[in-house]
């Protein structure tokens, strides 16, 4: 059953597996100490959901904020990358211990997983994450996941846990993702402006929806804002998952949001094949090719991408790398795994397939990107 209402996210029958993301500003107070009473109430909610047959995965921020206080670092540990890495090293121990302690009070076992962007961009490592999550959930454990900030560099960082939550949900085969935020959903303009209206349901993250995003995290403790939440919603949408943004500030925030039906629900598309869902959720492209109108129309009909329709090649990518396919207007039409490296694509662009063997010096492949290795956006 496809999720169409906010309350269905907390029902095992409609959402048998749910990812709950908790931000730094909710978990850690301005004094740098964990908000134990608030977190204890949230854990009670998670325990009740688990008892009702719903599997729950937690994506928890807070390690940097917790570690920064212990180390006496300014700016919440975010003054520099090295500060953030050091703070995370200390804070991860405290964060994992806190979750383990509170979950144990309900007879639940916490399992810590630390991930970097590369863990979910590389297909083999992604499948390993999928297998680990499946085993933990089958054993009735509650996975508690965070970005591995102690080793992640700018190049291999998610940068926020909103998108990490969506990618984890995709890897776990979850039906929904619940983002606990410091705001109760997406508004049609800056919610501080008079007349701002919350949007209860979004069907498709369009450019108009993106235009409604405002600013970053207001607390200074986290790294995510509405823009990152919309990017997470796009990942979820492509993977066939529902995603909701709710106000995480009340005690027992999930019950409060569901009882009042207050939040923004992003509706899912239909489920994709696992490989295409992984590809659609990838956040880093190695390059791009631009195509003409004829090729764009052929892609829309479900065809593979042929080199004859390519007009431009950009980036330094290898065969098998993920690249974006841009339309004549520069808009991203698809993502796919290239059958050629960038230099070969540049030689083949605009040329008919009968010319390819002479240009390459070997028997060509059937397409520049095969339709089975491509997802339309």
Curated annotation (Swiss-Prot):
InterPro entries xrefs: AceGlu_kinase-like_sf, Asp/Glu/Uridylate_kinase, G5K_ProB, Glu/AcGlu_kinase, Glu_5kinase, Glu_5kinase/COase_Synthase, Glutamate_5-kinase_CS, PUA
Reaction catalysis annotation: L-glutamate + ATP = L-glutamyl 5-phosphate + ADP
Residues that coordinate or bind ATP: 21, 181-182, 223-229
GO CC terms in record: cytosol
Gene3D superfamilies: Acetylglutamate kinase-like, PUA domain
Domain of life, per lineage: Bacteria
PROSITE patterns the UniProt entry points to: GLUTAMATE_5_KINASE (PS00902), PUA (PS50890)
EC number: 2.7.2.11
GO BP term, example: L-proline biosynthetic process
MF (Gene Ontology): ATP binding; glutamate 5-kinase activity; RNA binding
Protein name in the entry: Glutamate 5-kinase
Source species taxonomy: Bacteria, Pseudomonadati, Pseudomonadota, Alphaproteobacteria, Sphingomonadales
């Amino acid at each position: 059953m496809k999720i169409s209402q906010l309350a269905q996210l907390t029902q095992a029958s409609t959402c048998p597996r749910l990812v709950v993301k908790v931000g730094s500003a909710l978990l850690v107070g301005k004094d740098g100490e964990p908000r134990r009473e608030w977190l204890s109430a949230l854990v009670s909610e998670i325990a009740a959901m688990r008892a009702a047959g719903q599997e729950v995965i937690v994506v928890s921020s807070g390690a940097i904020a917790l570690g920064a206080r212990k180390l006496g670092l300014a700016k919440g540990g975010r003054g520099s990358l090295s500060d953030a890495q050091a703070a995370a090293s200390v804070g991860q121990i405290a964060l994992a211990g806190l979750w383990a302690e509170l979950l144990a009070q309900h007879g639940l076992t916490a399992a810590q997983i630390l991930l970097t962007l590369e863990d979910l961009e590389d297909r083999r490592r992604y499948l390993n994450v999928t297998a680990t999550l499946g085993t933990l959930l089958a054993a009735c454990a509650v996975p508690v996941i965070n970005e591995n900030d102690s080793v992640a560099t700018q190049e291999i960082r998610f940068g926020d846990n909103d998108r990490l939550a969506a990618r984890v949900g995709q890897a776990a085969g979850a039906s929904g993702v619940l983002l606990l935020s410091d705001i109760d959903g997406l508004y049609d303009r800056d919610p501080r402006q008079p007349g701002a209206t919350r949007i209860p349901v979004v069907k498709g993250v369009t450019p108009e929806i993106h235009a409604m995003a405002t600013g970053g995290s207001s607390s200074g403790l986290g790294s995510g804002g509405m823009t990152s939440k919309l990017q997470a919603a796009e990942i979820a949408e492509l993977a066939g998952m529902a995603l909701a943004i709710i106000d995480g500030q009340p005690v027992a925030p999930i019950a409060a949001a569901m009882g009042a039906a207050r939040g923004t629900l992003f509706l899912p598309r239909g489920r994709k094949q696992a490989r295409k869902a992984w590809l659609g959720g990838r956040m880093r492209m190695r390059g791009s090719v631009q195509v003409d109108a004829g090729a764009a129309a052929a892609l829309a009909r479900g065809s593979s991408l042929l080199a004859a329709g390519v007009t431009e090649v950009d980036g330094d990518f290898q065969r098998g790398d993920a690249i974006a396919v841009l339309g004549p207007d520069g808009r991203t039409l698809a993502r796919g795994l290239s059958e050629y490296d960038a230099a070969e694509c540049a030689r083949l662009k605009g040329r008919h397939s009968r010319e390819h063997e002479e240009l390459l010096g070997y028997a060509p492949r059937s397409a520049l990107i095969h339709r089975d290795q491509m997802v339309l956006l």
